[in-house]
Amino acid sequence: MKTATHPSYDEVRVQCACGNSFATRSTHKGDIHVEICSACHPFFTGKQKLMDTAGRVERFRRKYAKADKQADKQ
């Protein structure tokens, strides 16, 4: 069998733009810099903004209900 066919799997430091950092293992050489992590992402922090999809659905139904009524008249 060949020797040294697999890359080295070493510990690396991941640094976020918010200042958070953590250690993980990777074949990447050197530190990894990311723009967003689980400490600052709105989904994980619970500060995400929910969209009003119910209002959009009602507006869609009203729009096409009018179109159906006009089509029935013709």
From Swiss-Prot:
<feature type="binding site">
    <location>
        <position position="18"/>
    </location>
    <ligand>
        <name>Zn(2+)</name>
    </ligand>
</feature>
<feature type="binding site">
    <location>
        <position position="37"/>
    </location>
    <ligand>
        <name>Zn(2+)</name>
    </ligand>
</feature>
<dbReference type="GO" id="GO:1990904">
    <property type="term" value="C:ribonucleoprotein complex"/>
</dbReference>
<keyword id="KW-0694">RNA-binding</keyword>
<comment type="subunit">
    <text>Part of the 50S ribosomal subunit.</text>
</comment>
<comment type="similarity">
    <text>Belongs to the bacterial ribosomal protein bL31 family. Type A subfamily.</text>
</comment>
<keyword id="KW-0689">Ribosomal protein</keyword>
<dbReference type="InterPro" id="IPR027491">
    <property type="entry name" value="Ribosomal_bL31_A"/>
</dbReference>
<dbReference type="InterPro" id="IPR002150">
    <property type="entry name" value="Ribosomal_bL31"/>
</dbReference>
<comment type="function">
    <text>Binds the 23S rRNA.</text>
</comment>
<keyword id="KW-0687">Ribonucleoprotein</keyword>
<feature type="binding site">
    <location>
        <position position="16"/>
    </location>
    <ligand>
        <name>Zn(2+)</name>
    </ligand>
</feature>
<keyword id="KW-0699">rRNA-binding</keyword>
<dbReference type="GO" id="GO:0046872">
    <property type="term" value="F:metal ion binding"/>
</dbReference>
<keyword id="KW-0862">Zinc</keyword>
<dbReference type="Pfam" id="PF01197">
    <property type="entry name" value="Ribosomal_L31"/>
</dbReference>
<dbReference type="GO" id="GO:0019843">
    <property type="term" value="F:rRNA binding"/>
</dbReference>
<dbReference type="InterPro" id="IPR034704">
    <property type="entry name" value="Ribosomal_bL28/bL31-like_sf"/>
</dbReference>
<keyword id="KW-0479">Metal-binding</keyword>
<dbReference type="InterPro" id="IPR042105">
    <property type="entry name" value="Ribosomal_bL31_sf"/>
</dbReference>
<feature type="binding site">
    <location>
        <position position="40"/>
    </location>
    <ligand>
        <name>Zn(2+)</name>
    </ligand>
</feature>
<dbReference type="GO" id="GO:0005840">
    <property type="term" value="C:ribosome"/>
</dbReference>
<dbReference type="GO" id="GO:0003735">
    <property type="term" value="F:structural constituent of ribosome"/>
</dbReference>
<dbReference type="GO" id="GO:0006412">
    <property type="term" value="P:translation"/>
</dbReference>
<protein>
    <recommendedName>
        <fullName>Large ribosomal subunit protein bL31</fullName>
    </recommendedName>
</protein>
